[in-house]
Amino acid sequence: MLGGWTLCCRGAGHPPHGGELSQDQVRVSVVIPTHNEAQSIGRVLADLPADTVTEVLVVDSNSTDGTPGIASKMGARILREPRRGYGRACLTGLAEASSPDIVVFLDGDYSDRPAELPFLLAPILDGRADITLGSRLQEPRSAGALPWHQIFGNRLAAGLIRILYRLDISDLGPFRAGRADVLRALALEETTYGWAVEMILKGKLAGFRVVEVPVSYHPRIGKSKISGTLRGTVGAAWFILSLIVRYYFRHRRARNPRTA
């Protein structure tokens, strides 16, 4: 049982943007979007470092396999989000988090390892980053964790971001963390899987520090909802690439209205 999530709540001090966060006072909320993750959610929750995490919010979208019940028994706070969309679930979790200093986003399929969460927190805690991204392409991956078409699509999107935004990243993975004040200042609004890219782009354009951290990656438990097939990857990649270009030109028009 992980009752320690609520018992280890620390002081609610919120230092100004750009300063270091005290390890002893920081409040960390973990948001986990789920849809039929009964096979994996228990392992995800069990592996979260209880001495680091203040609260866990499982945002469930119409699961029919008992996912919310499993998560609730393990101490997670359950948020029901009947509306579809990965981004919508993440936004719901961000909005409902209880006065956090840092918000972590983690999938419920056990492809990322929750025990590696401190790696994402470290650059934020020592004042080097405002948003940290877990890169699955900088560390050795388990065989079959990412098919070639997903690797190609992620590298293509990351390459376009490097060119247009001058942000040196290698991956668009879902395991990430950010200062709560920064994430809320970005006014994120994407309700699809494009939400993860929106965070990166808006963060960079607003002048916040976006830093990558290597994380391991493993075959998910259960079937992918988005990009497990070549067809799904192509559709996701096209949407993400168009989003990257659209935000770039929108920003240029906003800065130079006479040249729009």
Spans of model-derived segments:
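A conserved acidic beta->alpha catalytic loop
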Residues: D60-P68
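Short, high-confidence coil segments that cap the C-terminus of an alpha-helix
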Residues: V53, S99-P100, R128-T132, F208
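Short, well-formed alpha-helical segments that are part of the catalytic scaffolds
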Residues: H35-A50
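Cell-envelope/extracellular polymer assembly enzymes that use nucleotide-activated donors
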Residues: R27-S29, E55, E198
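Donor nucleotide-sugar binding loop of glycosyltransferases
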Residues: E37-S40, S63, Y86, R113
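Acceptor/aglycone-binding surface of glycosyltransferases and processive sugar-polymer synthases
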Residues: P82-R84, R88-E96, P114-Y193, P219-G235, ...
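Hydrophobic helical membrane-anchoring modules
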Residues: L2-D24, I163-R166, L188-A260
